[in-house]
């Protein structure tokens, strides 16, 4: 996989007096090796995947040459990065109720240098989602969905856990040619974008509350 033009950009943008963001014109392509297994039976599907990324392109930090007190958020090449993922997806139909349940587990195998020492970034994570659809008379459809992401490592980052619930109602008209709906996302405003980024000279923590509604 070749790096994108955005990743190769040579410009810098200013976040604050200690942090800049920019590209890396010295990036080289990465090579991916994937091994996948999928099994399907009626409304149940299982998957298993192993990925080996050689010369992997990933998010990182580095020192700003003109000022050692400033770090640059950028992308770089890492010798290798490995992932093992497993998934299960269930989608039965029970009368007017059509639920969908998804379970995903990701186990990374990766190391970074953080404040002078090697740090394992091997914390696995689980992602769950449950989607519920009720097919009511007169073409009314009610939906109630929930998802949960556990804490885990993604590259040089530790992603904090989050969860959320969405609800909606839809109705179709004119033999399903027109659909009108009302949707409410993230009812409890709980899908936070918090993470920790581990670099050679610093550990950066960000807690964000995006407008996911």
Enumerate the predicted regions with their spans.
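Outer-membrane beta-barrel translocator domains and adjoining extracellular loop/strand segments
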Residues: 4-12, 18-21, 52, 56-65, ...
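Outer-membrane beta-barrel proteins
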Residues: 23-29, 34-36, 72-78, 89, ...
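Transmembrane beta-strands of outer-membrane beta-barrel pores
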Residues: 1-2, 12, 41-43, 50-54, ...
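Outer-membrane beta-barrel signature, preferentially recognizing the C-terminal barrel domain
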Residues: 2-51, 73-84, 207-213
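Residues on the lipid-exposed face of transmembrane beta-strands in outer-membrane beta-barrel proteins
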Residues: 27, 35-41, 86-94, 103-105, ...
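Gram-negative outer-membrane beta-barrel transporters
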Residues: 52-54, 70, 76-147
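Residue-level detector of the transmembrane beta-barrel scaffold of outer-membrane proteins
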Residues: 1, 8, 36-38, 45-47, ...
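Conserved C-terminal beta-signal and adjacent last beta-strands/turns
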Residues: 123-213
């Amino acid at each position: 996989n070749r790096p994108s033009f955005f990743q190769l950009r040579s410009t810098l943008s200013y976040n604050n007096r200690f942090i800049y963001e920019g590209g890396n014109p010295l990036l080289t392509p990465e090579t991916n090796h994937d091994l996948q297994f999928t099994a399907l039976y009626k409304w149940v599907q299982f998957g298993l995947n192993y990925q080996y990324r050689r010369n992997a392109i990933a998010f990182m930090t580095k020192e700003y040459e003109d000022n050692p007190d400033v770090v640059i958020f950028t992308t770089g090449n890492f010798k290798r990065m490995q992932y093992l993922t497993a998934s299960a997806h269930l989608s039965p139909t029970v009368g007017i109720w059509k639920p969908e349940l998804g379970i995903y587990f990701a186990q990374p195998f990766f190391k970074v240098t953080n404040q002078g020492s090697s740090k394992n970034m091997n914390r696995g994570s689980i992602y769950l989602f449950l989607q519920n659809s009720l097919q009511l008379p007169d073409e009314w459809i009610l939906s109630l969905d929930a998802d949960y992401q556990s804490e885990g490592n993604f590259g040089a980052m530790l992603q904090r856990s989050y969860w959320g619930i969405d609800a909606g109602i839809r109705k179709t008209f004119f033999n399903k040619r027109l659909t009108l709906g009302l949707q409410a996302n993230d009812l409890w405003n709980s899908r936070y974008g918090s993470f920790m980024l581990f670099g050679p000279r610093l550990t950066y923590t960000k807690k964000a509350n995006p407008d996911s509604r």
